[in-house]
Curated annotation (Swiss-Prot):
Single Gene Ontology MF annotation: GTP binding
Sequence segments annotated as region (G3 motif): 198-207
Source organism of the structure: Caenorhabditis briggsae
Protein name in the entry: Guanine nucleotide-binding protein alpha-15 subunit
Family: Belongs to the G-alpha family.
UniProt-annotated stretches for the region G1 motif: 36-49
UniProt entry tagged with the keyword Nucleotide-binding: yes
Covalently lipidated residues, kind S-palmitoyl cysteine: 5
An annotated GO cellular component: non-motile cilium
Amino acid sequence: MGSTCSSPESKEQNRINSIIDKQIRKDEDNEIGNQKLLLLGTGECGKSTILKQINILHSSGYTKTDLKNVAGTVYSNIIQGMATLIKAKDQFYHEVTSPELDADAQHILALAESSKDAMPFIPLTFNSIKRLWHDPTVQKTFERRAEFQMMDTLVYFMNEIDRINDPEYIPTVDDMLRIRIPTMGVVQQVIEIKGTKFRIFDVGGQRSERRKWIHLFDNVNATIFISAINEYNQKLNEDGNANRMKESIKLFETICNSRWFVQAAMILFLNKRDLFEQKLKTTSINVLFSTYLGSNDYAECVAYIQLRFERLNKYADVKKIYTHVTCATDTNQIQLVIDSVVDMVIGRNLRGTGME
């Protein structure tokens, strides 16, 4: 009779195969009930800030070590922001500055060009930043910031510059929410909210990053599309001729009507409402929307922009857009909005499974 015994190598391979099969089945089981949520939008619309808020509200938040580790990013954001202002000033104005201010500008530009990680400010750097910030020509340039690409958060950090310059400086949670690190590729986080696990994906919003979205589109439960509504008079970083809000509206139309998202909940965050309200005091949305004949009233302008987005939905008879007007750095407001979104997504899932 032939032997039915297996070799030791065969037994070991079978054991390994069994472990792999069990892990695959476990992963598949873990997928059941999970909600897949995409954060989409153009660059610098606030996607990463929303994900940080979700982490603060529904996960482990940020430890003291986490906060210490982003101090270099705060310093870098300030240096890069000031360098952007200096370059724009030189482009817009050709006024003769004092030798001291010229030296300050050259010092900051050299730091911005350095490949080294940003370090705590030495007295020369700190004093250069403050002198430049208070220079009238720099302030005139800052007032024209819609004409060039600049981080929204520079004003916040400049208002906190003395605290940030403290030798014992540790960034606060508010600082963490405002730092700018461009999302390259895809960032995934698994967070349990109200007993349901959400796999949340934050994907790069720059044009060059959008091609990386495609593999995420299968089995999406909900998409949060974020648009910074204060950008109606600003140019795109990747294309100085393209309006940022026009780009956002165009991308939303593509996402909203994509075959990939027919079954997914479509949630729209009209973000940066605080900056939008402030900008309306000096600049009408008519600069982009020539057919808008209303006033600069905040509520009226928000309603108009909301309509411009929502009317792009070609499946309005079967698909609703859930719109929220947000300020991503306002933790209390974002908590209410995220709770509402989670309840809606869970409710849709229960109805879809016949369990509600």
